[in-house]
Amino acid sequence: MLLSILLQVATGTGLAKLGEALGAGLAVIGAGLGIGKIGESAMEGIARQPEAAGDIRMNMIIAAALVEGVSLFAVVVCGFLL
């Protein structure tokens, strides 16, 4: 077990997998922060102007979907880097 782990690190696949995991993790964290900021701004806008809640909600969902799509693409690319 330990020998196989050491051989993986020695050949470089261990470091590649570490980079893959770090890249995917950073992409997901960034997407989470971005979607949180979108939600925060939407709630502030709805609180200021309740009559525009439908339009604000629709724009919020579209923006969150775009951010989530970019995050999913980044995770897939990180998965195929090896």
UniProtKB/Swiss-Prot annotation:
<dbReference type="GO" id="GO:0046933">
    <property type="term" value="F:proton-transporting ATP synthase activity, rotational mechanism"/>
</dbReference>
<comment type="subunit">
    <text>F-type ATPases have 2 components, F(1) - the catalytic core - and F(0) - the membrane proton channel. F(1) has five subunits: alpha(3), beta(3), gamma(1), delta(1), epsilon(1). F(0) has three main subunits: a(1), b(2) and c(10-14). The alpha and beta chains form an alternating ring which encloses part of the gamma chain. F(1) is attached to F(0) by a central stalk formed by the gamma and epsilon chains, while a peripheral stalk is formed by the delta and b chains.</text>
</comment>
<keyword id="KW-0472">Membrane</keyword>
<dbReference type="InterPro" id="IPR002379">
    <property type="entry name" value="ATPase_proteolipid_c-like_dom"/>
</dbReference>
<keyword id="KW-1133">Transmembrane helix</keyword>
<feature type="transmembrane region" description="Helical">
    <location>
        <begin position="61"/>
        <end position="81"/>
    </location>
</feature>
<keyword id="KW-0446">Lipid-binding</keyword>
<keyword id="KW-0813">Transport</keyword>
<keyword id="KW-0997">Cell inner membrane</keyword>
<feature type="transmembrane region" description="Helical">
    <location>
        <begin position="18"/>
        <end position="38"/>
    </location>
</feature>
<dbReference type="GO" id="GO:0008289">
    <property type="term" value="F:lipid binding"/>
</dbReference>
<keyword id="KW-0066">ATP synthesis</keyword>
<dbReference type="Pfam" id="PF00137">
    <property type="entry name" value="ATP-synt_C"/>
</dbReference>
<keyword id="KW-0375">Hydrogen ion transport</keyword>
<feature type="site" description="Reversibly protonated during proton transport">
    <location>
        <position position="68"/>
    </location>
</feature>
<dbReference type="GO" id="GO:0045259">
    <property type="term" value="C:proton-transporting ATP synthase complex"/>
</dbReference>
<comment type="function">
    <text>Key component of the F(0) channel; it plays a direct role in translocation across the membrane. A homomeric c-ring of between 10-14 subunits forms the central stalk rotor element with the F(1) delta and epsilon subunits.</text>
</comment>
<comment type="function">
    <text>F(1)F(0) ATP synthase produces ATP from ADP in the presence of a proton or sodium gradient. F-type ATPases consist of two structural domains, F(1) containing the extramembraneous catalytic core and F(0) containing the membrane proton channel, linked together by a central stalk and a peripheral stalk. During catalysis, ATP synthesis in the catalytic domain of F(1) is coupled via a rotary mechanism of the central stalk subunits to proton translocation.</text>
</comment>
<dbReference type="InterPro" id="IPR038662">
    <property type="entry name" value="ATP_synth_F0_csu_sf"/>
</dbReference>
<dbReference type="InterPro" id="IPR005953">
    <property type="entry name" value="ATP_synth_csu_bac/chlpt"/>
</dbReference>
<keyword id="KW-1003">Cell membrane</keyword>
<dbReference type="GO" id="GO:0033177">
    <property type="term" value="C:proton-transporting two-sector ATPase complex, proton-transporting domain"/>
</dbReference>
<dbReference type="InterPro" id="IPR000454">
    <property type="entry name" value="ATP_synth_F0_csu"/>
</dbReference>
<keyword id="KW-0138">CF(0)</keyword>
<dbReference type="InterPro" id="IPR035921">
    <property type="entry name" value="F/V-ATP_Csub_sf"/>
</dbReference>
<keyword id="KW-0406">Ion transport</keyword>
<comment type="similarity">
    <text>Belongs to the ATPase C chain family.</text>
</comment>
<protein>
    <recommendedName>
        <fullName>ATP synthase subunit c</fullName>
    </recommendedName>
</protein>
<keyword id="KW-0812">Transmembrane</keyword>
<dbReference type="GO" id="GO:0005886">
    <property type="term" value="C:plasma membrane"/>
</dbReference>
<dbReference type="InterPro" id="IPR020537">
    <property type="entry name" value="ATP_synth_F0_csu_DDCD_BS"/>
</dbReference>
